[in-house]
């Protein structure tokens, strides 16, 4: 895990001080060393910050060269199957000078070009310069675990880096993307327009999309292409639920094994939910000799009814884990809020990001560099509660015999009407229009018309009309008319997951930690997408096939746990803290000066207050 930087210039030669400025600002991503390289003609330069994970020697330093200097790489991430790829390349006569996954990636590209991406199991963002062909090849992993931002300067340069702030260090204008800001403030979401997924909160800065590569020529022409996608047509109706559970276990075990490869200490995040508990219990089972106890890291919230400590303790009691806890509170939040915003770079939807921040800080204090985490399961296994609505609608629309059984099971297992639209509900007083706004506002808004409406449904006085009038139109986003599988695809590959991965990358790298996500093995995700919907939602349960797969290694209370929380802090209580209220008021005044908030404004809810706070600090300070 590292930080990358680079410049391709068609005008003035690249200067080493430019590259150094770009790597110095992301020291946190790689405190173990840095490197800079400029080619002989001066039109290409790479920078790198190193966090040593695989092969701790200087032989693995970057930028790295291969093929008698023809190829040069700057790479951030991990190639988990590098040992298998290396063995295959050695059989073909390739020789290596290091034991790193970086050199394996570079050699594989030299051998296969763009096709190398098909063979990578990992998380990555990298750039390779081919001195013979004079092309810059850039690529990002399938789900977007690792970031890649880029911009074009006014003086004829293509500039890229892991983080947005690097680009500002070399002259890219820090100009706010007003439309993205409007969507965030007006619609309460951090999701970008799916028609323009490369957009960021800054006009001049773009992000390379997940599962895409980009070729840049010396005259700065670019060609972008998707190299991987989920096969929506593939569906296995022959497999039994037990065989599917067994295969799930096999693929997950293999994914965890690969993600345990490291030359530095490895631990796990533990929230007490099904996903993180599965990883901790699986590692415990794999660690048969128990020579080193698995360290787990968790956030607890004192005197909060949704604290998940009892579930964490069940996992700890059933394994040989060495638990460590942090207790985020409003005082810690006030103390670190500006730091969190500086690292996150763009607005984020709530203080749960801070809980993850505290977990990463704790891991650093315990000298554990790599953490396995459970992100990615919900998006493939229909883990969020609103998927019930999508699934039941699909069953009803198709006149499926499963509809009545699933509706009854849902009502028996959950609050009878929670999250269901009026056509399913016994409570006619509240429909999906009301319920799902609270349940899943980010996803729900994505498929609504992009039209002006109050952040909390009580008028538009909070935002300045001169600001909002620029964007008030009848323009619509694509309507969501598909079923469960289509919405799972949207969550994985269009919106939703990419934001969570952004938060995770910035939080972990702020403390020079590496987060690895076993549920995002593309082999596993492809398999899960081939399963019928009823293996994911069945008998009122989400993630049904997963519960079946791991019920023998998990505490029963977690396997068949109905509720889902996910590091939810006591936000309402925190927002009543005097220091936080002062921060909020200061932020609203700042946004008044920017012409974004109405001077006669009145915040109509906690979301208005939070959005003002995070926008002011991330974008205007």
Model segments located where?
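Cysteine-centered catalytic environments shared across enzyme families
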Residues: 1-338, 356, 552, 557, ...
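Short glycine/serine/threonine/alanine-rich loop segments
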Residues: 321, 346, 368
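C-terminal "lid/loop" region of Rossmann-like NAD(P)-dependent oxidoreductases
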Residues: 214, 298, 405-412
């Amino acid at each position: 895990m590292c930080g990358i930087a680079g410049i391709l210039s068609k005008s003035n030669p690249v200067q080493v001080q430019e590259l150094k400025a770009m790597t110095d600002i992301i020291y946190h991503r790689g405190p173990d060393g840095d490197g800079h390289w400029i080619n002989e003609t001066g039109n290409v330069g790479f920078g790198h910050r190193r966090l040593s994970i695989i092969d701790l020697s200087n032989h693995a330093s970057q930028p790295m060269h291969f093929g008698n200097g023809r190829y040069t790489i700057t790479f951030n991430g991990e190639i988990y199957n590098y040992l298998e790829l290396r063995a295959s390349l050695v059989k073909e006569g390739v020789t290596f000078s290091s034991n790193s996954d970086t050199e394996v990636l570079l050699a594989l590209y030299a051998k296969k070009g763009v096709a190398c991406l098909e063979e990578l199991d990992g998380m990555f963002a990298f750039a390779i310069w081919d001195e013979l062909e004079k092309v810059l090849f850039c690529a990002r992993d399938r789900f977007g675990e690792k970031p890649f931002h880029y911009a074009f300067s006014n003086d004829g340069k293509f500039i890229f880096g892991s983080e947005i702030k690097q680009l500002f260090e070399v002259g890219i204008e820090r100009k706010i993307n007003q439309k993205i800001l409007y969507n965030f403030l007006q619609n309460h979401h951090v999701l970008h327009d799916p028609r323009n997924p490369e957009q960021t909160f800054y006009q001049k800065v773009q992000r390379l999309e997940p599962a895409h590569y980009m070729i840049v020529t010396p005259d700065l022409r670019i060609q972008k292409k998707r190299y991987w996608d989920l096969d929506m047509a593939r569906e296995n109706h022959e497999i039994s639920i037990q065989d599917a559970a067994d295969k799930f276990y096999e693929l997950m075990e293999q994914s965890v094994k690969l993600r345990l490869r490291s030359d530095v200490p490895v631990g796990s995040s533990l929230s007490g939910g099904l996903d993180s508990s599965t990883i901790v219990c699986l590692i415990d089972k794999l660690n048969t000799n128990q020579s080193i106890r698995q360290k787990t890291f968790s956030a607890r919230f004192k005197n909060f009814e949704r604290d998940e400590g009892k579930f964490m303790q069940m996992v700890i009691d059933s394994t040989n884990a060495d638990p460590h806890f942090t207790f985020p509170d409003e005082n810690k939040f006030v103390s670190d809020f500006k730091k969190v915003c500086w690292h996150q770079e763009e607005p984020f939807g709530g203080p749960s990001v801070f809980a993850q921040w505290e977990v990463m800080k704790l891991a650093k204090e315990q000298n554990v560099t790599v953490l396995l985490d459970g992100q990615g399961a919900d998006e493939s296994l229909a883990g969020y509660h609103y998927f019930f609505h999508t699934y039941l609608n699909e069953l009803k629309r198709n006149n499926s015999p499963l509809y009545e059984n699933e509706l009854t099971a849902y009502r028996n297992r959950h609050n009878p009407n929670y999250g269901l639209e009026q056509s399913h509900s016994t409570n006619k007083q509240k429909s999906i229009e009301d319920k799902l706004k609270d349940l899943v506002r980010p996803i729900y808004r994505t498929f609504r018309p992009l039209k002006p409406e109050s952040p909390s449904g009580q008028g538009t006085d909070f935002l300045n009309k001169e600001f909002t009038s620029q964007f008030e139109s009848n323009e619509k986003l694509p309507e969501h008319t598909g079923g469960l599988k289509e919405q799972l695809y949207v969550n994985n590959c269009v919106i939703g997951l990419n934001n969570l991965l952004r938060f995770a990358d910035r939080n972990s790298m702020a403390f020079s930690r590496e987060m690895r996500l076993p549920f995002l093995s593309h082999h596993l995700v492809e398999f899960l997408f081939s399963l019928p919907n009823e293996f994911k939602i069945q008998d009122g349960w989400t993630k049904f096939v997963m519960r079946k797969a791991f019920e023998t290694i998990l505490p029963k209370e977690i396997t068949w746990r109905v509720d889902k929380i996910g590091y939810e802090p006591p936000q309402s209580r925190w927002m009543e803290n005097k220091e936080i209220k002062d921060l909020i008021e200061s932020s609203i005044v700042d946004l008044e000066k920017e012409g974004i908030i109405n001077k006669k404004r009145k915040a109509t809810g906690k979301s208005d207050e939070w959005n003002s706070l995070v926008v002011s600090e991330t974008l205007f300070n």
